[in-house]
Amino acid sequence: MVMVCVALVVPARAQGPDVNKVLADIRAKDQGQLAISEEDGRFLRLMIASGQRKRVLEIGGASGYSAIWMAQALRATGGRMTTIEYEPARAKELADNIRKAGFSDIVQVVAGDAFAEIPKLQGTFDFVFLDAWKRDYKKFLDLVFPRLEKGGLFTAHNVVNKKGEMEDFLDAIQRNPALWTTIVSPAGEGISLSYKK
């Protein structure tokens, strides 16, 4: 009788970037309070994953905290994101944080004025996250809405705690017959969700 022993060798999984550490480092350095809350980040990740979103636009990337939350979901959906940041130094920090978190292959960082950069982008979007100058929210909606796919979500941050700075935007998303809109507030700042019918 011959006995054959077969050993299955499973290679050790390569350790990737510690995304939680990158997120914690960004929060620790966020002196200007520009980053969204962790609760809002988890909410955005869930919205992208559950909706199987694949083409995401972020307007106002800051240091990359929200982009990293969304990129986690995009890794699962096979999607990609473009994030735009106006301040050059902050855009560099954003790109560095995206690289440290291991998402450079799916997140494109654009430094510049979003009003000038968005028209240069190709294609449409199925998810938009807006967290830029509050007084410009309505202008961004007008610029991006034609490129939001049917069934897409247009989301905006700070719609509760800074609603006085964006009344025209809030009125527009509530009255537009092509949108179903609601507002949620996981951490008190508020996120509007507008679904394009």
What function would you assign to each model-found segment?
Residues V10-F129, K134-K197:
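A short alpha-helical cap/connector motif
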Residues M1-V9:
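Bacterial N-terminal signal peptides
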